[in-house]
Amino acid sequence: MKTQLVVLIVALVFMQLFAQSEAFWSTIWNAAKSLIGKRGLRNLDDLDQFDDSFEPELSEADLKYLEDLLR
């Protein structure tokens, strides 16, 4: 009876390890497929999404607003 319980516990532990490693490998596989695929390569350009939101030049209205804000 003790042997059967030990075998059951060991089997459950190995099943959990396999299930977790399967999820890990499937996540890595899906990430690799998305990077290699045409859509994945096209989406790499979207990483620069914040480039348009930063304007290095300040207009006169911006300077006036900053002066009023800092008074």
Curated annotation (Swiss-Prot):
Coiled coil: none annotated. Expressed by the venom gland. GO terms for biological process: defense response to bacterium; defense response to fungus; killing of cells of another organism. The modification Isoleucine amide is found at I36. Residues 1-23 form the signal peptide. The keyword Secreted applies. GO terms for cellular component: extracellular region; membrane; other organism cell membrane. It comes from the Eukaryota. Residues 37-71 form a propeptide. Disulfide bonds: none annotated. Keywords: Amidation, Antibiotic, Antimicrobial, Cleavage on pair of basic residues, Cytolysis, Fungicide, Membrane, Secreted, Signal, Target cell membrane, Target membrane. It is found in: Secreted; Target cell membrane. Antimicrobial peptide with potent activity against bacteria S.aureus (MIC=6.25-12.5 uM), E.coli (MIC=50 uM) and yeast Candida albicans (MIC=25 uM) and Candida glabrata (MIC=25 uM). Is not very effective against P.aeruginosa (MIC=300 uM). Also provokes moderate hemolysis on human erythrocytes (HC(50)=10.8 uM). Belongs to the non-disulfide-bridged peptide (NDBP) superfamily. Short antimicrobial peptide (group 4) family. This is Antimicrobial peptide VpCT2. It comes from Mesomexovis punctatus (Scorpion).
